């Protein structure tokens, strides 16, 4: 529990730091870092769809935290176990809006709206979601430290 709280605090601090930066602190649009993050998003999407455990282990930082649409919080080991067991499978991930990437030195925050079909933690999932991903660039390159899905109400 202490580990979870410290990871959550770090993720909140990262997002708060990123949001609090002035626009001049951001890199220019289509910067090398932004392009790298966009490439990582596509690698992540492909790895999730293909249940590519080796790639996901590299993409997710050791202290990675996922908050699903039901509000459940899962660590890297729990997500990997769910994918290995088949409890988490995605049949499709479709971007409904352009992905927004904001880069702040060695961190990036991405937001998008996606349509998902499959299951998370053994529960069916289908519909539109708002997605936020927090990336950090370290010695291993860009890694995902946290992401969250929020279900959107049908219009």
Which stretches of residues belong to each language-model region?
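Bacterial N-terminal signal peptides
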Residues: 7-18
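Short, low-complexity N-terminal intrinsically disordered segments enriched in polar/charged residues
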Residues: 19-62, 143, 155
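Hydrophobic pocket/interface hotspot
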Residues: 44, 56, 64, 79, ...
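A short gly/proline-enriched turn/hairpin at secondary-structure junctions
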Residues: 48, 63-74, 85-89
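A mature extracytoplasmic/lumenal domain signature
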Residues: 60, 70, 105, 114-116, ...
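Surface-exposed, charged secondary-structure patches
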Residues: 82-125
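Short beta-strand edge/turn micro-motifs at domain boundaries
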Residues: 128-153
């Amino acid at each position: 529990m202490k580990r979870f709280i410290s990871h959550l605090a770090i993720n909140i601090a990262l997002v708060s730091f990123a949001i609090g930066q002035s626009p001049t602190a951001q890199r220019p649009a289509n910067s090398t870092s932004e392009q790298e993050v966009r490439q990582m998003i596509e690698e992540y999407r492909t790895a999730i769809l293909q249940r590519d455990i080796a790639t996901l282990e590299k993409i997710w930082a050791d202290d990675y935290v996922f908050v699903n649409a039901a509000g459940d919080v899962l660590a890297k080991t729990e997500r990997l176990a769910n994918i290995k067991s088949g409890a988490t499978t995605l049949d499709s991930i479709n971007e409904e809006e352009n992905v927004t990437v904001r880069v702040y030195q060695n961190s990036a925050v991405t937001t998008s709206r996606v349509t998902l079909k499959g299951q998370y933690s053994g529960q069916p999932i289908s519909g539109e979601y708002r997605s936020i991903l927090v990336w950090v660039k370290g010695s291993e390159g860009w890694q995902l430290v946290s992401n969250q899905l929020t279900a959107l109400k049908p219009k």
